[in-house]
From Swiss-Prot:
Matches recorded under Pfam families: Glucosamine_iso
Catalytic activity, EC: 3.5.99.6
Keywords: Carbohydrate metabolism, Hydrolase
PANTHER family assigned: GLUCOSAMINE-6-PHOSPHATE ISOMERASE
Catalytic activity line of the entry: alpha-D-glucosamine 6-phosphate + H2O = beta-D-fructose 6-phosphate + NH4(+)
Family matches, as InterPro entries: Glc/Gal-6P_isomerase, Glucosamine6P_isomerase, Glucosamine6P_isomerase_CS, NagB/RpiA_transferase-like
Name of the molecule in the record: Glucosamine-6-phosphate deaminase
The keyword Hydrolase belongs to this UniProt entry's keyword annotation: yes
Cystine bridges: none
Species annotation: Clostridium perfringens (strain SM101 / Type A)
Length: 242
């Protein structure tokens, strides 16, 4: 696992964007696994800047998102499809037919999960998977527990996750309680994984991810078993690392 510590969130975002941009330039038909939440917003802004300045071409890129809330349509302003469109896809030349997010309104969630895994396999797997870190160690919506799912699955969100995401909604009561998430198996099959984290609130989980005991109670520790992980964090998130 490679570690890069940056001075602040802005620098972390720029370093992460540069890392992804270099992979896109090496492989214009790259399959990107993308994440949502507050942490990658700055990175996406930097990728948009690079595109606008002629440094990047997304026309042949395919993207697969980690997760989606159950019960929200793609045009709901708190859905992850909407997030991706407004924070990245609407501002670059990616073909939206090649951008995939789980269907939060699927009538048969089990079938949607199986179809999502099949789609990942059909496009040849993920070349670069971007991950943020939940304060409780979740990656995607793979929450701490006695066991972790291998494939894409329906998951009940932990109260800590609901509370963390409540800032995006009018009320905590509006936060969905379930989500469709790519499983640990799908994430671990990615050829390369890039993890980004910012702020003191992520320091404990960053320390655990780097050197803690591998346990399903902190899903991020599973990344220790992956052959190619780069962790990009700011100084606050790295404060507990020796």
């Amino acid at each position: 696992m490679r570690l890069i510590v940056t001075k602040n969130y802005e620098e972390m975002s720029k370093v992460a964007a540069k890392e992804m941009a270099e992979d896109i330039k090496r492989n214009p038909e790259i399959v990107l696994g993308l994440a949502t939440g507050g942490t990658p917003v700055g990175m996406y802004k930097e990728l948009i800047r690079m595109y606008n300045e002629g440094e990047l071409d997304f026309s042949k890129v395919t993207s697969i998102n980690l997760d989606e809330y159950v019960g929200l349509s793609g045009d709901h302003d708190q859905s992850y499809r909407y997030f991706m469109n407004t924070n990245l896809f609407d501002h670059i030349n990616i073909d939206k037919n090649n951008t995939f997010v789980p269907n939060g309104l699927a009538e048969n969630v089990e079938e949607e999960c199986m179809a999502y895994d099949a789609r990942i396999q059909d496009i040849g797997g993920i070349d670069l998977q971007l991950l943020g870190l939940g304060a409780n160690g979740h990656i995607g919506f793979n929450e701490p527990g006695e066991a972790l799912s291998v494939g894409t699955n329906l998951t009940d969100l932990k109260e800590s996750t609901i509370e963390a995401n409540a800032r995006f909604f009018d009320s905590i009561d509006d936060v969905p309680r379930k989500a469709i998430t790519m499983g640990l198996g799908g994430i671990m099959k990615a050829k390369k994984i890039m993890v980004i984290a910012s702020g003191e609130g992520k320091a404990e989980v960053v320390k655990a991810m780097m050197s803690g005991k591998i346990t399903t109670e902190i899903p991020a520790t599973m990344l220790q078993m992956h052959r190619d992980v780069i962790l990009i964090v700011d100084e606050d998130a790295a404060k507990l690392l020796k």
